From Swiss-Prot:
Pfam families, per database record: Ribosomal_S13
Lineage, highest ranks first: Bacteria, Bacillati, Chloroflexota, Dehalococcoidia, Dehalococcoidales
The protein's name: Small ribosomal subunit protein uS13
Region entry Disordered, spans: 92-129
Transmembrane region(s): none
Subunit structure: Part of the 30S ribosomal subunit. Forms a loose heterodimer with protein S19. Forms two bridges to the 50S subunit in the 70S ribosome.
Gene symbol of the encoding locus: rpsM
Lineage top rank: taxon: Bacteria
Ranges of Basic residues composition bias in the record: 92-114
Length: 129
């Protein structure tokens, strides 16, 4: 396996798809890196020469923020929003959707599993017999 930016990328796949295993590199950025390095995107990783692998490593390390650095930057951005006390920061702090989605129903992924409340199973106004 080839190791680029601290991530093992699979040997048996095309370079275009293998680069996407690195956090911070998606389809568009993968293609951009391959064009800059002058590597065919259809070639498999195990067919790459050492020179091509080094060019890919160099381009990714110099020009893009990936893996740990990117994760750290994202975490610091969220922390900054929380520290300044803005609306988005408060939404992050309370584990609610940040981008304006409804929360009366749905938003279960962000809010977590339902918290059951005693006595909520009956309809209002109904009396027991």
């Amino acid at each position: 396996m080839v190791r680029i930016a601290g991530t093992d990328i699979p040997d048996n796949k095309q370079v275009y798809f293998s680069l996407q295993y690195i956090f911070g590199i998606g389809p568009a950025r993968s293609e951009k890196v391959l064009v800059q390095a002058g590597v065919d995107k259809a070639i498999r990783v195990n067919k790459l020469t050492d020179e091509e692998i080094n060019r890919l490593r160099e381009i990714i390390d110099k020009e893009y923020r990936v893996e740990g650095d990117l994760r750290k930057e994202i975490a610091l951005n969220i922390k900054r929003l929380i520290d300044i006390g803005c609306y988005r920061g408060n939404r992050h702090k309370h584990n609610l959707p940040v981008r304006g989605q409804r929360t009366k129903t749905n938003a279960r992924t962000r809010r977590g599993p339902r918290k059951t409340v005693a006595g909520r199973g009956q309809k209002r106004g109904a009396t027991k017999k």
